[in-house]
Structures are given as structure tokens and as C-alpha cells.
UniProtKB/Swiss-Prot annotation:
Keywords: Cytoplasm, Heme biosynthesis, Iron, Lyase, Metal-binding, Porphyrin biosynthesis. It comes from Salmonella paratyphi A (strain AKU_12601). The keyword Metal-binding applies. This is Ferrochelatase. InterPro entries: Ferrochelatase, Ferrochelatase_AS, Ferrochelatase_C, Ferrochelatase_N. One of its GO terms (cellular component) is cytoplasm.
Amino acid sequence: MRQTKTGILLANLGTPDAPTPEAVKRYLKQFLSDRRVVDTPRLLWWPLLRGVILPLRSPRVAKLYQSIWMDGGSPLMVYSREQQQALAARLPDTPVALGMSYGSPSLESAVDELLASDVDHIVVLPLYPQYSCSTVGAVWDELGRILARKRRIPGISFIRDYADDGAYIDALAKSARESFARHGEPDVLLLSYHGIPQRYADEGDDYPQRCRDTTRELVSALGLPPEKVMMTFQSRFGREPWLTPYTDETLKMLGEKGTGHIQVMCPGFAADCLETLEEIAEQNREIFLEVGGKKYAYIPALNATPEHIDMMLKLTAPYR
């Protein structure tokens, strides 16, 4: 009997190919066209997206990308490639592919790469620690569309999320402790998660609960008093209410109240990207310092640290 050959697909959101208005426009068009991300009726959404949002946002977002672009590309792509390579090095007999929901390399190219390696079972690990319909759900949808076009469909193991996984919490706690050792223990540790529309949660998305699960376990692992840790939500888009409290408004409030030392961690981001390196490490730093805050430090994402790769090994082990 032929032994099953398993491959691993690491999935993440994606990134523009270049920090230019044209590349950003292509990326945003694909991203904001996904009904999992924006579910506004298409008759209303298409004219707004194509006539207003893309022309106005693309040049501005391109400038933000230019401020963080690395020699090897966007930070998300650089760190995602490092994750793929590090995991592959630990699993020499298991093909590991990287696929993005939007942009390249696509999820379809990752599936094709694994099938070309003659795998008959794929472990899909979306690198979103906390499930949301707009992230993990989008990977699930696209995977279904891809496999619907294939004559040979492999077995699939799909890891929904890992918000309270012990190895994940341990990796976050180690990262936080290293930051405390470097900068001193903060007055407040702010855990900033990407937001989603409040309506999505009202309709059943358990993302807020999974964020609370991560926060609870991390506070316990660090042994911090609960009053020294705050959970907030960032990166809201559009006019409808999103999950609260908002990160930027919370930092402004803390600075105005005289909180001197803040450290910010973004547990929901597996790799540093525009939302962490520019929005949190730069924009939100300015918000806090401008209203009287004294010390602000951003704690980097887990990226390709050994502890993060250990976590990936643990999560995928039952399916390999």
C-alpha cells in the first residue's frame, strides 16, 4: 500500500508586489472585491470601489509601503518566505508551500506546487491565530474554488485557528518578556488585534471571543495584573461600527491620563506588515507621545523566530 505523502500549505493575506500606486491598486482591488472582506451589495460597492476608493487610496497607501519596504520586498513577504524556509528546513521530507489569499504567490500556485511534489494530503495552516470569516473563511472559500477545478483532489486537513494553543501563547510570552527586559516593564501592555465590523460578530463570527481567549492565556502566562493589560482593535475601514475599543483612541486616552510607558503587541499578526510596522509602530506612537505619553515600544510579530516555527511544527504534527 502506498504511504501517504503530506505537504503543508502556509496561508496568509498577501501584499502588493511593489510599493507603487499601480501595484497597490491591483492588490487592493482583489482584496476589497472579496465578499468575505466587504459584503456590501455589488451594485453599490463596485462604483464606490472603482471610482472613489482605489483612485484615492492607492497613491496614499503606496507611500506608506515605501516607508517600510525591505530589500527583499514587503515585510510580510520577506517574513513569510523566512517562515516557509525555516519550516521546510525542519521537515526535509515534507514539502512546504506558501500561498496568499490576494496577490502572489497565490493559494492556487501553492496547491499546484504541492501537487507537483506528488502529495496526496495537504495540511492547510492559515497564519491567523484567531479565526474570522474575513481571513480564515476567505482561505477556505478560495481553497474550495481551487479544488473544484482539479481532477485529482488531495486529502485536506484544515487548521481553523490556534488562539489559545500553548506553544503560540508561550512564543508570545517569550517575546513580551524580551521586550520588558529591553525597555522595562510597561505601565500598560496593549494587545492590539485587527478589527472587523461589529456586524460580523453580531452575525456569528467568533473572532472577538478568540481574541479574548488569546488575551486571557497571555495575561496568565505573563503573570501580569489584569489591570495592566488592555485589548483593543485597529485598522478600521469604512463608516460602519467596528469592534471596540479602538487602538488609536485608547492610546490617546492613555496619554492624556498621564500613562507614561506603553508597550504594544499585535498577537493576531503572524508576520510584521504595514498594519504593524507603520500603523502601530509609527502612527500610533505619534498619537501617544503627542498627548503626553513618555515611552512607547512596539513588540515585533513572531515572524520566523524559532519559537514560532516550533509552534507550526506542533500544530501540523497530528496531520503529518
